[in-house]
Curated annotation (Swiss-Prot):
Note: R.meliloti has a classic glucose-6-phosphate isomerase (AC Q92SC4) and two archaeal-type glucose-6-phosphate isomerases.
Cited InterPro entries: G6P_isomerase_archaea/bacteria, G6P_isomerase_prok, RmlC-like_jellyroll, RmlC_Cupin_sf
A GO term, aspect molecular function: iron ion binding
Protein name: Putative glucose-6-phosphate isomerase 2
Subunit structure: Homodimer.
Cofactor note: Binds 1 Fe cation per subunit.
GO biological process assignments: gluconeogenesis; glycolytic process
GO cellular component: cytoplasm
Annotated positions binding Fe cation: 92, 94, 101, 140
Reactions that this protein is recorded to catalyse: alpha-D-glucose 6-phosphate = beta-D-fructose 6-phosphate
Metal-binding among keywords: yes
Species the sequence originates in: Rhizobium meliloti (strain 1021) (Ensifer meliloti)
Family per similarity comment: Belongs to the archaeal-type GPI family.
Known pathway: Carbohydrate degradation; glycolysis; D-glyceraldehyde 3-phosphate and glycerone phosphate from D-glucose: step 2/4
Lineage: Bacteria, Pseudomonadati, Pseudomonadota, Alphaproteobacteria, Hyphomicrobiales
């Protein structure tokens, strides 16, 4: 028997970084990101004043969990640094790793940091109207390298799931994004890929 779902509509509110009409919302505070940054003393200093502040939030619309369906949503990330590392998401690979994902930049300046199963590293600059294709099997995380909130829409198969423990089990991704130079605007921000020198 053919089961049909009703068409749906959501609106991306770039100003708030949320999806109007979302069926789900979750947030990560800075306190939730323990162990993510190299500079533990800088992290603890931030926690002392902003521990319960939202580092990033996700709102999404999930019609179903069926394999042929899709999830759409919006991620909003705060700007800033801990030590010399930019604010970033925990990163993940899909629980069904052969599932892809798409990201579309709405506002801000960011980098999509990707790592293949073979340890290959790719970085994709994310700005407004930039679309990023994350292939199957690639671990990925978002990094806000700008001075304003980074807002992106995304879409992936509804049965993909997320595995957030893979990075922790591996001891971190192979690269981090840090900042050099003086920050006085987006054009002065330079992502520096530091290879195996540092691990998260």
């Amino acid at each position: 028997m053919l089961i049909l779902f009703e068409p749906g509509v959501c609106q991306v509110d770039v100003a708030t970084g949320r999806l109007k009409g979302a069926t789900n919302r979750y947030v990560k505070t800075f306190r939730d990101l323990a162990g993510l940054y190299r500079d533990e003393s800088a992290y603890q200093a931030l926690i002392a004043t902003r521990g319960d502040d939202v580092a990033y939030e996700v709102t999404d619309y999930k019609p179903s969990a069926n394999g042929g369906d899709i999830i759409i949503g919006v991620t909003r990330m705060e700007p800033g640094k801990i030590g010399d590392e930019y604010f970033m998401t925990r990163g993940h690979i899909h629980a069904r790793p052969n599932r892809p994902e798409m990201y579309y930049g709405e506002a801000g300046v960011g980098v999509m940091l990707l790592e293949s199963p073979h340890g290959e590293i790719r970085t994709i600059e994310m700005r407004a109207r930039t679309m990023c294709y994350v292939p199957p099997f690639w671990i990925h995380r978002s990094v806000n390298v700008g001075l304003e909130p980074l807002v992106m829409t995304f879409s992936y198969p509804a049965d993909a799931g997320q595995d957030y423990d893979v990075i922790a089990k591996a001891g971190g991704m192979r690269t981090v994004l840090s900042m050099t130079g003086t920050v006085d605007g987006p054009q002065s921000i330079t992502p520096v890929i530091q290879g195996d020198t540092h691990r998260l």
